[in-house]
Curated annotation (Swiss-Prot):
Record's keyword annotation contains Iron: yes
One Gene Ontology MF term: superoxide dismutase activity
Annotated keywords: Antioxidant, Iron, Manganese, Metal-binding, Oxidoreductase
EC top class, as a word: oxidoreductase
Catalytic activity: 2 superoxide + 2 H(+) = H2O2 + O2
Designated name of the protein: Superoxide dismutase [Mn/Fe]
EC number of this enzyme: 1.15.1.1
Domain of life: Eukaryota
Cofactor: binding comment: Binds 1 Mn(2+) or Fe(2+) ion per subunit.
Cofactor(s) required for function per UniProt: Mn(2+); Fe(2+)
Upper lineage: Eukaryota, Fungi, Dikarya, Ascomycota, Pezizomycotina
Task performed by this protein: Destroys superoxide anion radicals which are normally produced within the cells and which are toxic to biological systems.
Assigned protein family: Belongs to the iron/manganese superoxide dismutase family.
């Protein structure tokens, strides 16, 4: 998963 500081969740691609 990619940790995105601007989003309240982790995005898994």
């Amino acid at each position: 998963a990619y940790e995105l500081p601007e989003l309240p969740y982790a995005y898994d691609a």
